[in-house]
Amino acid sequence: MKVILLRDVPKIGKKGEIKEVSDGYARNYLIPRGFAKEYTEGLERAIKHEKEIEKRKKEREREESEKILKELKKRTHVVKVKAGEGGKIFGAVTAATLAEEISKTTGLKLDKRWFKLDKPIKELGEYSLEVNLPGGVKDTIKIKVEREE
């Protein structure tokens, strides 16, 4: 029996593939558990259409991420924090703080998960920060942590 897989199934195939499996396996396991549906040309067209929509969505997401990255790379972003003598920050600068401060200055909507910090920043200075945007867009931006006057 021909089936179209609705999910990835180990040792059978990936989502959207058309596979030939035994009737019993299809009727007693794959179809009742929602892993597959019986093959029809209409269902195949619908799945191809869904894949095309998903592909366009990912492409649009990638383009949007590239625009955001281009805007982020234009300048060194300054984050002002309260600090004591010797450049020690009261508290720490986290990814959430960075996203919030950079959003204020650029007007972009940024997510804290896009900024990769191994550990929070606890001293004043300049840093290179890795940014992982949706759509697989990655690069580094420069930030400068300064004392608040």
UniProtKB/Swiss-Prot annotation:
GO biological process: translation
Keyword annotations from UniProtKB, A to Z: Ribonucleoprotein, Ribosomal protein, RNA-binding, rRNA-binding
Function: Binds to the 23S rRNA.
Domain of life: Bacteria
Any one cellular-component term (Gene Ontology): ribonucleoprotein complex
Keyword Plastid: no
Molecular function per GO: rRNA binding; structural constituent of ribosome
Upper lineage: Bacteria, Thermotogati, Thermotogota, Thermotogae, Thermotogales
Pfam families (UniProt xref): Ribosomal_L9_C, Ribosomal_L9_N
Gene (UniProt): rplI
Protein name (record): Large ribosomal subunit protein bL9
Source organism of this protein record: Thermotoga petrophila (strain ATCC BAA-488 / DSM 13995 / JCM 10881 / RKU-1)
Protein family (similarity comment): Belongs to the bacterial ribosomal protein bL9 family.
Family annotation (InterPro entries): Ribosomal_bL9 (IPR000244), Ribosomal_bL9/RNase_H1_N (IPR009027), Ribosomal_bL9_bac/chp (IPR020594), Ribosomal_bL9_C (IPR020069), Ribosomal_bL9_C_sf (IPR036791), Ribosomal_bL9_N (IPR020070), Ribosomal_bL9_N_sf (IPR036935)
